[in-house]
Curated annotation (Swiss-Prot):
The chain crosses the membrane at residues 444-464. This is Syncytin-1. The record marks R317, V318 as: Cleavage. It comes from Homo sapiens. The lineage of its organism: Eukaryota, Metazoa, Chordata, Craniata, Vertebrata. Glycans are attached at N169, N208, N214, N234, N242, N281, N409. Residues 465-538 are cytoplasmic.
Amino acid sequence: MALPYHIFLFTVLLPSFTLTAPPPCRCMTSSSPYQEFLWRMQRPGNIDAPSYRSLSKGTPTFTAHTHMPRNCYHSATLCMHANTHYWTGKMINPSCPGGLGVTVCWTYFTQTGMSDGGGVQDQAREKHVKEVISQLTRVHGTSSPYKGLDLSKLHETLRTHTRLVSLFNTTLTGLHEVSAQNPTNCWICLPLNFRPYVSIPVPEQWNNFSTEINTTSVLVGPLVSNLEITHTSNLTCVKFSNTTYTTNSQCIRWVTPPTQIVCLPSGIFFVCGTSAYRCLNGSSESMCFLSFLVPPMTIYTEQDLYSYVISKPRNKRVPILPFVIGAGVLGALGTGIGGITTSTQFYYKLSQELNGDMERVADSLVTLQDQLNSLAAVVLQNRRALDLLTAERGGTCLFLGEECCYYVNQSGIVTEKVKEIRDRIQRRAEELRNTGPWGLLSQWMPWILPFLGPLAAIILLLLFGPCIFNLLVNFVSSRIEAVKLQMEPKMQSKTKIYRRPLDRPASPRSDVNDIKGTPPEEISAAQPLLRPNSAGSS
């Protein structure tokens, strides 16, 4: 898993191209300054302090950088090492790898997700993509005589590559080793778009560091950037002598290389920040730890995959019944009829337009079939002429050495289908002509009629209710006035008060007829009653 999966996918799916053989690279050193970490498991659960193996003096080591900015060189030339193309050039900037005036080598392409700012690495990648596209166009665009259907190339294209299968198998093996459930039925999925690689720190109990690999080629610089780090604790960290940090809560152990330049065995990487390195030269300013790199795979069980792919049905919530009834009545009385009328007119117009479109489709099919019939007639005439010209050599097919092709006229099926379409169009046109917008509205009358009675009652009540109310009020007022007029004389007679007895009118039964009194003086009940003086009475 040292090689990112979409790097070898790019190499596999795109055919390779050939370049002229460049001169060998001159980026060799007589003695390797790099050393390898070597761990030995002494007892389970404990890892001894790392030991280092330096290459013997005189062993040539090739050193190349994975990234070279555009402002580090004026010009670059191609060179070759171990059947691989590299760029070489002289550094013009002291801050560049190697220093000012030093000739260094770097990879032909930039690493995944990186750019050199429009330098030779980016230009080489663009050139490679253009050549591959032109090659694919040339291979698949050349027309060849028809010799039957050949799906062999399609099968080769669709076949999963061996290295991709190996990647899946390695992932599954690792899953079985680290998973306690040991899943047997699962789905391993790769993303179609680019996603960052996943960094998994080297676990505390790990016993596979004893693999020794001779380092004859060293790649300095980041191999992958923008990593996704899964864990930030229990890390095995690397500390160089020029670094200032000594403790970190995320690290459970520290290892200090004896030199500033060190490499890791294949399959293990230094992760510094969000970039992965195979070799470090001690110039990293951030904390580095040991990690594995895995592609951004997603593992699903059968149940998880089904729940992820197949969407669950959405259950409708049951609204409150009074709210439904109230909303239905208000909608029917307020805006129901207008909405139904608008929808009916809209669908009627849509049906007419659809009918016209179907008619045009039928006409297009008839026109296309006529063109095919005329083309077939021309081809048959040409075929007969070629058969006459090549009759001495056995006819056209024998002359070309190909299979004979015959034309089967199936225009009758197309004509029959067009006739059925036109019959349906005619029926729909008659239905629309007989129905009309008000005919479509009649289909909604069974739904509207139950609301017409309450609606008419409410309208009549609003129209005639005020008049009836005014009549009732006037009638009651007139009766009250009549009763008041009848009761007023009686009330006045009961409220008269006389000053003297002689002031009272004579009773019909009285025998005194010659007594003349003064007219009675009416005194209102509100005035005080005057009593006669005892001295003045006679």
